């Protein structure tokens, strides 16, 4: 594989100290629609999201679930990670491609929830230590 082609942003995960406050801000101030809010409130899912458009969401990840920043060098402030989408052809060789480019895979392939439902994802760090998720639906 020559290189992968990312086609769109899927989601951004923000570490938030107060999920309810963040939901109010993103829904009432910025006009984004809450998703999985009732499931979060009932304990069925670990975090809610707000939708930017049909293909992009912001996950509001409670900091109580995040590793402490001194232990978790992959995070920079409140950015947990961001996710890019690739096509099936690019994803089929993603682990070999990353390994060939001396990029260590932190996790995956693994099934995770995203802006359009479940998909298969791989996680790794960029040169500055930001966690990147690449996924294929």
Each predicted region: which residue ranges?
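Core segments of cupin and vicinal oxygen chelate
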Residues: 15-58
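Conserved beta-strand in the GNAT
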Residues: 59-61, 133
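A short, acidic/glycine-rich surface segment
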Residues: 36, 65-71, 108, 112
């Amino acid at each position: 594989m020559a290189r992968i082609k990312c086609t769109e942003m899927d989601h951004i995960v923000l570490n938030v100290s107060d999920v309810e406050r963040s939901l109010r801000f993103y829904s009432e101030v910025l006009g984004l629609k809450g998703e999985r809010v009732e499931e979060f409130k009932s304990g069925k899912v670990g975090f809610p999201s707000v939708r930017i458009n049909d293909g992009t969401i912001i996950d509001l990840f409670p900091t109580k679930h995040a590793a402490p920043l001194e232990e978790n060098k992959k995070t920079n402030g409140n950015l947990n990670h961001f996710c890019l989408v690739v096509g099936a052809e690019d994803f089929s060789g993603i682990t070999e491609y990353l390994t060939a480019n001396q990029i260590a895979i932190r996790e995956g392939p693994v099934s995770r929830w995203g802006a359009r439902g479940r998909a298969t994802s791989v996680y790794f760090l960029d040169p500055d230590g930001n966690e990147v998720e690449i996924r294929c639906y």
